[in-house]
Amino acid sequence: MIILFGGEKGGTGKSTLATNLSVWLSQKKSDIVLLDADRQCTSGNWSSQRANIFPNLPQINCVQRYGNIAATIQDLSKRYEHVIIDAAGRDSEELRSSMVVADVLFSPLKASQSDLWTVEHLNELIKLSRAMNQKLKAFAVLSMASPNPKVSEIAQAKEMLKDYSELSLASAVVRDRKVYRDAMCEAKGVIEMSDDRAKEEIETLAKEVF
């Protein structure tokens, strides 16, 4: 399966979710590769650090490619069971070329007005991609949300996202938890940490498509 984490807004947790899903799949003994298509190289650096510090943990093969990466993705999909793509947070050649070959798009969004304003153009981009890739499933993932259950922004964002025909709302809501930052610094996934709430969030996200 080819799973793309991408969107039109930076700083929404795409690399965090891409690396965490990669670890989740590695724990299931899946043969995976992580494709870092973001020039900030967050996923690539995370993978390198993991190999250097924790050689006994399941390792995540990572390659870095930029530009039109459709052919690279198709080649990797023949050699690996799953390809996880981390694309930059903007309308880019990497994002568009990934969308025409991906099976699944997860687009993380903060429950903020500035993030939600980007959804209309993303919705149109998905529609264009589906003209060439009818199998593409697209999910909006509410990410970095307040862990305070009394905050109403999640309900408001969910209501707003109902207006977009090309995007389904993922069941998972990923909260703004320190453990995600700790896991990134330690080159781990949260399922290798001790926070059960974060583990459940990644499990819920993974079970959206597995």
Question: Predicted segment positions?
Answer:
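Inter-motif core of Ras-like GTPase G domains
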Residues: 94-113
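Hydrophobic positions on the alpha1 helix immediately C-terminal to the Walker A/P-loop
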Residues: 16-17
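Beta-strand-loop-alpha "switch" segments that mediate conformational coupling across diverse proteins
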Residues: 157-188
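G-domain G4 guanine-recognition motif of GTPases
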Residues: 110, 137-152, 172-183
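Conserved C-terminal guanine-recognition region of P-loop GTPase G domains, centered on the G4
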Residues: 117-135
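P-loop/Walker-type NTP enzyme "switch/lid" segment
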Residues: 2, 6-8, 12, 23-93, ...
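C-terminal boundary of histidine-terminating zinc-finger modules
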Residues: 184-199
